[in-house]
Amino acid sequence: MNTAIKPLVLLLIGGATTAAQAAAPGDEVIPVKKSTLVNLVDLLVQRGVLKPDEGQGLVRAAEQEAAETQAAQVKSNEAKAATSTAEDAGEPANSAPKTGKTKHVGYVPEFVKKEIRDQVRAELKAEVLQDVKQDAKTEGWGIPAALPEWVAAIHPSFDMRVRFADEFYGKENAGGIANAGLDAAGNFFGPYNWLAINRLANSPQGGLQRQVSQNPNEAIVNNQIDRLRLRERFRLGFEANLSDGLKAGVRFATSNLNNPVSNDQTLGNTGQSYQFAIDRAYLRYDYLDERKTSWFSLYAGRIINPFLSTDVVFDPDLSFEGVAGSVRLPFNRGTSKLAGYKAPNPTARFGINQGQQTPDSLFLTLGVFPLQDIDVSVNDKWLYAGQVGADWLVWHDSRLNLAASYYEFQNVNARRNPIGSHVYDWTAPQFVQKGNSMVAITDDQTLNGVCDDTVGCLFGLASRFKVFNATAMFDYAGFDPVHVLLTADYAKNLGYNQQKILTEFANGVVNYTDSRPRTTAYQIRADIGQVEVRHFGDWSVNLAYRYVQRDAVLDAFTDSIFHLGGTNAKGWVIGTQYGLSKYAWLNLRWLSTDAIDGPKYSIDTVNVDLNARF
């Protein structure tokens, strides 16, 4: 600001001083005293407009110019006096009368002129350059001519996360490797790695008890020794606009190929390469009317979670395979309430999915998703899902989401093999975490001679899963840009049948001492801060309490961080996010959880995530 004002100030001072000192007594010029000039210069120096050496130089220059002007004026007056008599005597009768006034032109020092020229040139150059850059960006100079049209339609995305995961186990935890998977009463507890046990089910090493005794590090999940891991996730995606409303997308990601709820790669594979997989591959069609309002969306392939939900039911990293469609009935379209409103990223808050909906609409979403392909098609495992809800922009940017969902998982529950048969081996789960009630598909009664374990050799889920889920989210924007998001989530498994389990399976539930229905889950959560952490200094904090009984939801798809994955857990979650730059932010979460049923099993988990994206 000072550099822009300074040349003008110097010009005013120089011009005013010179004019005042050179003026004749009859001129209409206000004389400026030397003391006034000095005081003015001192004031400008104090205000920071001029530097001290510039002020002193200005005063000296003004004094010198005044002296020279005064000397010149004296000589001019003497010359006029010497010639005045002759001029008066010989003046023609028709000559013009003299006014007695002299015109003066203010003198501007050269250094002031130079500074003005340099300042104007620099400011003009900056303004022109900025205008050119803006026009080039807006009009896309050079791109249409240099690249094919289809290239300009492709939009890349990238994100990367490095995680420090520290896990602290309760010192009084029961079971575990040290106790051979037994609780204090000698009951089988584990916690067991069911996938590792099932892999050897039909081999000479098969059987839970044999696996526990011969290979405890694989058969039993660690729940006593603290652990620190460094993990990394890398994702690279592309989405292409093929035509009006039609898009195609693909996303590559680091991945544990056998884990659908985590894209994390644990560091420590020196000499080996990371697993890199296609995490998403899909087509999406949006029907738009003449107002560009989206009434209908159709997804096919390996797609994003299309449902309004939380990580109580579905982990944030979970992708859905199949077909889904969403129909929206807009309301309040005749008002200006939606003008200027931009819906935030629906997954910006970790663990929350606000759905692929638009504000001020009623919606219905249906989906059919194959979970596992079996040789005989009637035995394929499926997820049939439906959701109805409302998305309401209440006032300004405050938004209310309500949804009721029903998720039916077909053919995921275990069936006991007939004697001497493997016919129901396919009912063993392809992936589980921990928590759901387990039963023996094969035991010493069904395949005596092949399986001699009294507990069992091959295990599956005891319960059917028909999950009702109700979710409510209210995003209050009264403190904008700080928002307050309140979330309530409730889930109930309607498919659990205790009598059927006890009738079909002789040993009943093998990982709990009872088979009573434990089928309820809920979460209460509050988020305070910016909706999206996208710039330096942006922040967000959250606090949640979660309670998930063992058969409330399918443990394979629920959050993989809370209680280190699975169900039968309750506890608190505290988290914060802070923006480090436009493309980087820090995420810190602390989770403290305990088992609801069974022997004591406590875990404290700390995750520190460094994230980057563009």
Briefly describe each language-model feature range:
Residues 1-21:
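Gram-negative bacterial Sec-dependent N-terminal signal peptides
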Residues 222, 421-614:
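Outer-membrane beta-barrel pore domains
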Residues 165-195, 331-344, 411-432:
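Internal, charge-rich low-complexity segments
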Residues 164-292, 307-315, 455, 493-517, ...:
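Surface-exposed loop and membrane-interface regions of Gram-negative outer-membrane beta-barrel proteins
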Residues 153-155, 225-412, 519, 523-557:
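Outer membrane beta-barrel
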Residues 23-24, 53, 126-157, 166-173, ...:
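Secretion/assembly modules of Gram-negative surface proteins
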Residues 141-147, 200-229, 348-361, 443-463, ...:
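Intrinsically disordered, low-complexity acidic Ser/Thr-rich regulatory segments
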Residues 20-220, 345:
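N-terminal periplasmic/intermembrane-space "pro-region" immediately following the signal or transit peptide
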